[in-house]
Amino acid sequence: MKFYALIPAAGSGSRMGGAIEKQYMDVNSVPMIAHAMMVLAREPRIARIFVVLSPTDKRWNNYEWQGWEERIEVLRCGGGTRAETVLNALDAIAEVCDPADWVLVHDAARPCLPDEMLGKLLDEVADDPVGGLLAVPVADTLKRAAGDTSSGTRVEATVPRAGLWQAQTPQMFRHGTLTEALRAAGSDMTDEASAIEKLGLQPQLVESDSRNLKVTYPQDLELASLILGKMNA
């Protein structure tokens, strides 16, 4: 049994509103995706890391990746959605990956994954029959917006937060099971665990923390920079 990692990086990050794709934006003078790659590369149990790019990506080759060759392989098979990108990558690595091998899917836009959280995920899920993901219990009070209002966005109801968790990545599932799940679920799945759930399976939740944030909006870049600065101090 081996562990492999996938970093889907074929999207544009439209909510960031930047001039370049989100995964290539600088965080502490390093492309965001490189931070995600580095933490995975530091984990010796991960046999190989596959970075999944759009076939039309023109920025990857603008950077110096010398020294990464033994750990990183680039796949230019990204699709129109995250689910399509991950499924295309799973198909591309099927010849080297046994159906029982573990695949960890990690967001390129999560540059602050702590080493110990990655290790915790591997330790707790390696013997699980389904797989699992990093996640954090929801702490804030949640409000559901009313669907039809003429006077601005209004609260329709408060959503009980008991039992609610915020999904993070990596999300870790066996190659065969994840391939089956994504093929059956279609292209609108926003994370891998959702596809696994549609098979009737229950992924394990492995508690993480707020350092492992996803950079989604411009203000998140400053926070990610501060977190990385403290982690690397």
From Swiss-Prot:
Question: What gene makes this protein?
Answer: ispD
Chemical reaction(s) catalysed:
2-C-methyl-D-erythritol 4-phosphate + CTP + H(+) = 4-CDP-2-C-methyl-D-erythritol + diphosphate
Checking CDD domains in the record gives: CDP-ME_synthetase
UniProt record, GO biological process: isopentenyl diphosphate biosynthetic process, methylerythritol 4-phosphate pathway
Residues the record annotates as the site (Transition state stabilizer) are: 15, 22
What function is annotated for this protein? Catalyzes the formation of 4-diphosphocytidyl-2-C-methyl-D-erythritol from CTP and 2-C-methyl-D-erythritol 4-phosphate (MEP).
Query: What name does the UniProt record give this protein?
Result: 2-C-methyl-D-erythritol 4-phosphate cytidylyltransferase
Q: What is its EC number?
A: 2.7.7.60
Write down the position(s) of the site called Positions MEP for the nucleophilic attack.
Answer: 161, 214
Family as reported in the entry's similarity comment: Belongs to the IspD/TarI cytidylyltransferase family. IspD subfamily.
| Taxonomic lineage from the root | Bacteria, Pseudomonadati, Pseudomonadota, Betaproteobacteria, Nitrosomonadales
Q: Which InterPro entries match?
A: IspD (IPR001228), IspD/TarI (IPR034683), IspD/TarI_cytidylyltransf_bact (IPR050088), ISPD_synthase_CS (IPR018294), Nucleotide-diphossugar_trans (IPR029044)
Question: Does the keyword section mention Nucleotide-binding?
Answer: no
**Molecular function as annotated in GO:** 2-C-methyl-D-erythritol 4-phosphate cytidylyltransferase activity
